[in-house]
């Protein structure tokens, strides 16, 4: 991390999540750039999941609209977030993937929300069909 970036979240406090028996860790990656209008709804949809063994990683492309303030406000609810200039959405997604620790990786756009059963359903299929790539 350089002087032109900010970061935070539970990992900064050395709180790491991992797979549990029959409960794979799901890494949820959200990429955002100047979308403070919807970001908090997206964060809350992750927090409201029935399936709790997940981590939320948010990669911000150095927003200027107040997005970082939303991230700071939710610092204790997000596993890891960083705000730094990137080379576009795919660069940001790749950063998120490199930071992920889960057996499953899910992309959640910053203006989207999860239905509360989404991760529970996805992980049940993941556990049931071991030979299928999702």
Segments and roles (model prediction):
Residues 1-134:
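Nucleotide-sugar donor-binding/catalytic module of glycosyltransferases
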């Amino acid at each position: 991390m350089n002087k032109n970036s900010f970061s935070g979240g539970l990992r900064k406090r050395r709180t790491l999540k991992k797979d549990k028996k029959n409960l794979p860790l799901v890494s949820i990656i959200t990429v955002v750039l100047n979308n403070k209008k919807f970001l908090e709804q997206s964060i809350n949809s992750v927090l409201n999941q029935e399936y709790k063994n997940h981590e939320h990683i948010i990669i911000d492309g150095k927003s200027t609209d107040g997005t970082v303030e939303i991230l700071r406000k939710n610092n204790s609810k997000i596993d890891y977030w960083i705000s730094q200039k990137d080379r576009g959405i795919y660069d940001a997604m790749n950063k998120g993937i490199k930071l992920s620790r889960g057996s499953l990786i899910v992309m959640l756009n910053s203006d989207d929300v999860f239905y509360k059963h989404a991760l529970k359903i996805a992980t049940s299929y993941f556990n049931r069909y071991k030979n299928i790539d999702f």
